[in-house]
Amino acid sequence: MCCPLYAQKENSNAASLKKYNSSNNNRAGKHLFIDVHHLGPGKITYEGVAEAHAKDLAVERKYGVEFIKYWVDTARGTVYCLSSANDTESIIKTHAAAHGLLPDHIYSVTEGTEAAVNGGKNLFLDIHELGAGNVTAGDVAAAHQKDLAVQKKYGVNFINYWVNEKDGVVMCLSEAPDSSAVIKTHKEAHGLIPKYVLEVKQGQ
């Protein structure tokens, strides 16, 4: 899925958000990955990414890949794709065959337990870059519980998170009134402030 074709006029209607437990896609012998495409401001639209995603879905089985969800940050021109695959090479081959738009980074990740989407609020993906060897999945699980304990105070609903232990990268998906609410929740819960808080639209 993951990369846009050409910039078009963006549809203001947000894609419908559906609860989907992606852990069901982490089948025997496969792993979860998030691949990231940096196209640049003004270079993508949600509609363009959706078209590219459809092309990925048309060829993914050939390479043993299952694209689960994707998130689009049109302001920065960045796309994040969640998939289940045997390895990173399979993801690259799928994108190459589908539309030729290759990811800049691919992270092998573990995820938390997905919560229900409430709807009616903006969707945010916040990124923590903690450094190689500085975080474990267990650490993030504990921090996530602290987030859940205080999130209502700021009107936030944390939906899920993904951890790459090798590079020390954590990505958290949430619904919130604004980015400051996400930051305030993290700050009060455990003090770990994200490097980026991106407003995104989700597709699958």
Question: Can you say where each PLM-predicted feature lies in the sequence?
Answer:
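Generic short alpha-helical segment signal, independent of protein family or function
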Residues: 84, 96-99
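Short S/T/G/P-rich N-terminal loop/turn motif that feeds into the first structured element of a domain
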Residues: 3, 7-62, 66-68, 72-77, ...
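A common structural junction motif
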Residues: 98-105, 189-196
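Helix N-cap motif at beta-to-alpha junctions
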Residues: 84-90, 175-180
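Charge-rich, low-aromatic oligomerization/scaffolding segments with amphipathic character
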Residues: 91-96, 182-186
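C-terminal end-helix/capping segment
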Residues: 196-202
